[in-house]
C-alpha cells in the first residue's frame, strides 16, 4: 500500500497568510542585515519556494480551507490568537484545532491565558519557540516549568521547536539534550518536537525510546528532507511517535508537501498513524 489519499489528514502546523509583520518578533533579536531589512520571511535563505504570494489575501481563512480541501486535510491545528484565527475557530470548529503560543517570559499571565483559552476555545495544545523569545528561554529553563505543569493539569500536549533554528538567531536554548530534563521532571507530559531536531535526530530517537510521552512532528521540513533517522525509527519501533506537520503558508506550499510525501519510505502500517492517528490520539480528538 502506498500513501493513502482519503484518510482525512490532520496537519499539526498551519497558519494564515495575514502579513509579514508576524515575523517582527524575530527581527527584533536578529543582527544580520538580511533578516532585519531584506527578508520578508526570516528563513528565505532556506525556503526558496515559500508561497509568499498568498500573504495579504482578502479572506485568508478561505485560502487555507481551499488548500486543505485540495490535498485531503480534514483538520488543521492553528493558533487561537488574533481575529483571523478566532473567526476560523468559531466558523469552522470541525476543521480547525485550537492551540496557544506560550511565552515563559510572561510568567503567570500566560498560565491564566492558557486556562482562559481552554475554557473559551477548548484548547488542545500549547506551542513554544524557545529561540524566538526575547530573551530566549532554554527548553529546560525553570521559566518553562509552570507551563509544563499546566499542560499536565489540563491534559494537553506541548509542541516545542527543537534543534538549530532556521532564523539567524542563537541555537543553544533548543539543543535536544535539554528535553531529557523536562521528561524526567514531568513524566506525565506529552511533549512533541517541532522543526526537525537537527543535527541531533539520533539523540531525539534515543530520547523517544526512553520517554513514553516524547513525540516528533515533521514541521518545517519538505518531505524529501525528512531525516533518515526519523524515517527509520517510524518504520521500526516508533510508528506511534512520528506525527505529520506541514509548514503552510509560512515556508512550504501544501502542493509541494503532498507531491513529495508519497516518496517518503514509510511502511504501509505507518502511513495512517503518521498522517492522522497519532495526532488524533495526542490531541484527544
For the regions a language model picked out, list residue spans one by one.
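Mid-to-C-terminal alpha-helical segments outside catalytic/metal-binding sites
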Residues: 1-12, 19-70, 238-243, 251-285
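Divalent metal-coordination and catalytic microenvironments
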Residues: 13, 68, 76, 98, ...
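A cross-domain feature marking catalytic cores of carbohydrate-active enzymes
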Residues: 14-16, 80, 100-104, 127-130, ...
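Alpha-helical packing segments of well-folded alpha/beta enzyme cores
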Residues: 60-67, 71, 113, 143, ...
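A structural motif corresponding to the C-terminal end of an alpha-helix
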Residues: 66-74, 92, 154, 185-189
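Active-site gating/metal-coordination segments in enzymes
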Residues: 74-75, 81-166, 170-173
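Short alpha-helical
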Residues: 83-84, 199-200, 224-225, 252, ...
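Catalytic pocket-lining loop regions of alpha/beta-barrel enzymes
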Residues: 124-125, 137-243
